Amino acid sequence: MGKEKEHLNLVVIGHVDSGKSTTTGHLIYKLGGIDARTIEKFEKESAEMGKASFKYAWVLDKLKAERERGITIDIALWKFETENRHYTIIDAPGHRDFIKNMITGTSQADAAILIIASGTGEFEAGISKEGQTREHALLAYTMGVKQMVVAMNKMDSTEPPYSEDRYEEIKKEVSTFLAKVGYKPAKMNFVPISGFQGDNIQENSTNMPWYKGPTLCAALDSFKIPKRPIAKPLRLPLQDVYKIGGIGTVPVGRVETGVLKAGMVITFAPKGCSAECKSVEMHHEEVPEAAPGNNVGFNVKGLSVKDIKRGFVASDSKNDPATDTESFVSHTIVMNHPGEIKAGYTPVIDCHTAHIACKFEELLTKADKRSGKMTEENPKFLKAGDAGLIRLSPSKPLCVETFATYAPLGRFAVRDMRQTVAVGVIQEIKKKATEDKKGKKK
């Protein structure tokens, strides 16, 4: 047994037809946890449907369908490994809810693969003002995904095929817009690939002798492994709460920061009720403790299913326990709201697992969305493309944190008209004054 491989969570972004599914499917197909039998089955099914060319994308479509049907999808199917690393693809944006998922994320992405279609006309469509490519890159950057590799896909369909001139042209343009978003393109790898043919995915392509850089896999392996927030106090947003016969109340969720241990007295915010954690379970096995990234169920004594619910946050009562939030100030980027956002606007906010209406109490500043520099104080409104500092107050009890202290609880999506209209990063919080047992305000 050698040293255990390091693990990275990847998010795959890019325009809708850039070939994300094919490229991602190819990685999983070549390096993943899918056995040959399953792949043969997929190939046969896609051939029967007359979609033989989609065999890699088909891998992903099948996984998506299963993922949408139930939560018990075998997560191995979304994993692949290289010689040095394990990777999990935490989201591939085929979903309408991709933006929401990326923010409230089932998991924080450590790095991104930005897939660009290099075919004639395709690149221009993806990068145009309305293109999703820009939005996704800005989103990834705002949400703290600072490492990225650019995969220039469909090099087999440039004119002429595998054109170095086309590669250079696109690289220049993508670099310009990534630099505006905040990335440092000079430090990034731009890998020319064909997700379908397999050029430069694992092995250097003989079709592009002019390219001297790393393959896609080698570029992924050059990402730095982030430090997991294990030393921070515990924060565990609840996804569900179950009542299990003979055991009792079992909250379920993912440890975002710190460590959950049996025997710990847990405080649930925003309500403020506490109970002892009797046992911790992962994958149906009891474990002494759970670390960041672990999905767990834990048994609490003395609380009923009525006391706690999805969106509550579990924390250690003795180490910076989580509390109810009176109001918070956030750096907010308005993405695709059709009108003007003014003070008084009350959309639903998705922050970690909480889903609560919050009122935009005050528009404090308007800022340049890329540099964050203030351009106006107390603006009358913000519209799509604007950014600014906004003070919000929740309509019901809510527990959030600042992005700087507990990142996963400090970023949110603003949902309205069945879409994500804005995203925010929380900069400061005003906590509700709590009363202690004797009724005195703390």
Swiss-Prot record:
One of its GO terms (cellular component) is cytoplasm. Residues 5-227 form the tr-type G domain. GTP binds at residues 14-21, 91-95, 153-156. Its main location: cytoplasm. Residues 194-196 are annotated as: G5. The keyword Repressor does not apply. Residues 70-74 are annotated as: G2. Residues 14-21 are annotated as: G1. Residues 153-156 are annotated as: G4. PROSITE patterns: G_TR_1, G_TR_2. It is found in: Cytoplasm. Signal peptide: none annotated. InterPro entries: EFTu-like_2, G_TR_CS, GTP-eEF1A_C, P-loop_NTPase, T_Tr_GTP-bd_dom, TRAFAC_GTPase_members, Transl_B-barrel_sf, Transl_elong_EF1A/Init_IF2_C. Disulfide bonds: none annotated. It holds the Pfam family GTP_EFTU_D2. NCBIfam families: EF-1_alpha (TIGR00483), PRK12317.1 (NF008969). Belongs to the TRAFAC class translation factor GTPase superfamily. Classic translation factor GTPase family. EF-Tu/EF-1A subfamily. This protein promotes the GTP-dependent binding of aminoacyl-tRNA to the A-site of ribosomes during protein biosynthesis. HAMAP family: EF_Tu_A. This is Elongation factor 1-alpha 1. It comes from Euplotes crassus.
